[in-house]
Structure formats: C-alpha cells, structure tokens
C-alpha cells in the first residue's frame, strides 16, 4: 500500500482546499411582494414567477393547517 513520502505542509494543504468554499445562494427581491426569493424559483410568499401566479399559496397553507389539526 502506498504511503506519503513527506508530510504535507500547511501551505499545500491550504492550496488544495482553496476551491472547497461554499458560495452564498443567489437571492433576489420578488417584484410582486418585495420579499427575498431564490432566483429562477417561484416566490414562496406570494407564489408568483415571471409575473404570473404559478403556486396557490393559500391552498397549500390551508392543506398544512388541516393536516396538522388532524394529527393532534
């Protein structure tokens, strides 16, 4: 089995890990309700995307409320 010939220095270790950092998500403002949303995603507050309503947020909220009420 192969073994490292020399100990890796901190500089080489850091250079290898230079590309491992996470980037912040691309957050933009919803033009409809001005809440923060992910780009290229429907708004989770008002349910619009590209100027159209694509998600019925009220129906989803009601469904969640009914589901949680039934589990009690």
UniProtKB/Swiss-Prot annotation:
- What Pfam families has UniProt attached to this entry? Ribosomal_L32p
User: Which Gene Ontology cellular component terms are annotated?
Assistant: large ribosomal subunit
Instruction: Give the UniProt keywords, A-Z.
Output: Ribonucleoprotein, Ribosomal protein
Which gene specifies this protein's sequence? rpmF
Q: What residue range is the signal peptide?
A: none
Report the InterPro entries cross-referenced here. Answer: Ribosomal_bL32 (IPR002677), Ribosomal_bL32_bact (IPR044957), Ribosomal_zn-bd (IPR011332)
Q: What is this protein called?
A: Large ribosomal subunit protein bL32
Among the GO biological process terms of this entry, one is: translation
Q: Which family does it belong to?
A: Belongs to the bacterial ribosomal protein bL32 family.
Q: Which residues form a coiled coil?
A: none
Source domain of life is Bacteria
Organism name: Dehalococcoides mccartyi (strain ATCC BAA-2266 / KCTC 15142 / 195)
Q: Which GO terms describe its molecular function?
A: structural constituent of ribosome
């Amino acid at each position: 089995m192969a073994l490292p010939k020399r100990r890796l220095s901190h500089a080489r270790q850091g250079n290898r890990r230079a590309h491992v950092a996470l980037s912040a998500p691309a957050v933009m403002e919803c033009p409809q309700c001005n809440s923060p949303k992910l780009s290229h995603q429907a708004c989770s507050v008002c349910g619009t995307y590209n100027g159209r309503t694509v998600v019925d947020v009220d129906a989803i909220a009601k469904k969640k409320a009914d589901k949680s009420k039934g589990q009690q």
